[in-house]
A protein has these predicted regions:
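Acidic/polar loop patches that form or flank catalytic/metal-binding clefts of enzymes
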Residues: 284, 295-302
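A conserved regulatory-domain signal marking ACT and ACT-like small-molecule sensing domains
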Residues: 309-468
């Protein structure tokens, strides 16, 4: 990286200018300048399963880590899929546990798991006696083996191998990531424990799990290694948290629908949360909070294209970000819209409360609520099917909307993240010109929500992307 230069004023009567250079690790000052503290940069790099699927990808991770000396803390997932027909190690471990519950041998599955890690060890030229680790785990398996204890072993083995490959210290996540009895992260205790264990050293720690007060292993939900990376960055006051995956950042649209969508250069924490809420699957839902609390930027990058900057997520407001009127799109499909009408509905909070309670009573999952003049619009989906949806609509009518409830099924919601209201008319025109009617629009800042027929969702998304 080309040296950046910055001038500081020396605290003296002469107010001379002192020039400092940034070398990628920290600020370097002239020898006679002692009035500034040099801060060494720290990057926490988390690598997902797709980046760790085989020995070749392990070696690629080593190149990435070695290319920046600030990457002194590494968090790893279990080995992912090597190709489309392959299985993630975590999926195989879940299957092993299911076999144990029904007292069926999981030996064949275990051999597949063992072969993956032995191949990685051999392909990387490592010496770790991984067979001993695998044998010890298998020997401990019984029908009483805890699910979390078993499925966490993928991350554990990945971290053991990566620590040897990088010549970093292995730090077990169970030794620092603390949960309470209800499974909530104990932030202060976890941060203090990692600070003590890391103590300025280069470390590798497994993602996805920690330890309960009882000593038992506890995992996050799937994708939880993202959370571990964020917690490690927050604990150590990192300058940057990197999340390495197989895509070049957060894409502006679903690549299975839009051909070669561009990555988004910058998102604020709030913008990322908004896109996640409306269906963009980027990070584990709990991964942003620790970084946001510490104001630590998150960089999402691709191990396949490490030269690309990826997407940066940070504390700056959208006004300070690279400007684009239409930034990106996300959405949900398989929704229904219920529209209840009643005079004075918007002035009766108790009726709104009862209306939403009625929908929840029938098992509806609410996606979005908009209250207008004498009208309540709810976007929701019913896990129990159409009959439950219409039963919920009838209960809503009885509870809060005697003037009627209209139900429209088979809808999709397209959410457009925008920076500037002037883009709205252009976006709506593009979708309508593509022959897609918009049944409802609502501003859910910083996104505009547009309800379309589910069968036309992909057409609407392509038209919206072309309107950027």
């Amino acid at each position: 990286m080309a040296a950046q230069r910055i001038a500081f004023e020396r605290e003296s009567a002469l107010s001379e200018s002192v020039v400092a250079s940034y070398n990628g690790l920290g600020w370097i000052y002239p020898n006679d300048c002692c009035c500034f503290e040099v801060k060494t940069m720290l990057t926490v790099a988390k690598f997902g399963g797709s980046s760790l699927a085989d020995a070749e990808r392990f070696l690629r991770v080593r190149e990435i880590v070695r290319s920046d000396i600030s990457r002194r803390v590494v968090v790893v997932s279990a080995a992912g899929k090597r190709h489309p027909g392959d299985h993630k190690i975590t999926d195989l471990l879940y299957l092993c546990h299911a076999h144990l519950q029904y007292k069926i041998s999981c030996w064949d599955l275990w051999r597949r798991i063992a072969a993956r890690y032995i191949d990685i060890r051999n392909g990387c030229g490592l010496k770790l006696p991984v067979e001993e680790e695998l044998d010890a785990i298998y020997a401990s398996l019984t029908p009483e083996t805890g699910l979390d204890a078993l499925v966490s072993r993928g991350e554990y083995l990945s971290a053991k191998l990566m620590a040897e490959l990088l010549d970093y210290q292995f730090v077990d996540a169970a030794d620092w990531l603390r949960f309470d009895c209800a499974g909530n992260v104990l932030y202060a205790e976890s941060y203090a424990a990692l600070q003590s264990l890391a103590d300025g050293r280069k470390i590798v720690t497994p993602g996805f799990y920690g330890r309960l007060p009882s000593g038992a292993i506890r995992t996050f939900s799937r994708g939880g290694s993202d959370v571990t990376g964020s917690l490690a960055a927050a604990a150590l006051h990192a300058d940057v948290c990197e999340n390495w995956t197989d895509v070049p950042g957060i894409l502006a649209a679903d690549p299975s629908i839009v051909e070669r969508p561009e990555p988004i250069a910058y998102l604020s924490y709030e913008e990322l949360q908004a896109l996640s809420t409306v269906g963009m699957q980027v990070l584990h839902e709990s991964a942003v909070l620790p970084l946001r609390q510490r104001q630590i930027p998150l960089q999402i990058r691709s191990t396949l294209r490490p030269e690309l900057p990826g997407t940066r997520i940070g504390p700056l407001p959208a006004a300070d970000a690279p400007q684009a009127e239409l930034v990106g799109f996300a959405g949900r499909r398989g929704l229904a819209m219920l529209r209840a009408e009643r005079a004075g509905l918007e002035q009766a909070p108790e009726l709104l409360r009862d209306a939403l309670a009625a929908l929840g009573q029938k098992g509806l999952k609410i996606f979005h609520v908009a209250c207008g003049l004498e009208q309540l619009t709810v976007l929701a989906y019913s896990p129990d099917g159409s009959d439950a949806l219409h039963a919920a609509a009838e209960l809503l009518r009885q509870t809060a909307a005697p003037e009627g409830v209209k139900v429209r099924e088979n809808l999709g919601v397209l959410a457009a993240l925008h920076r500037g209201a002037e883009a709205t008319s252009r976006l709506v025109s593009a979708i309508q010109n593509a022959g897609v009617p918009i049944h409802h629009m609502a501003e859910a800042a910083p996104c505009l929500l547009m309800v379309v027929n589910d069968s036309q969702y992909e057409t609407a998304l392509r038209a919206a992307y072309q309107a950027r």
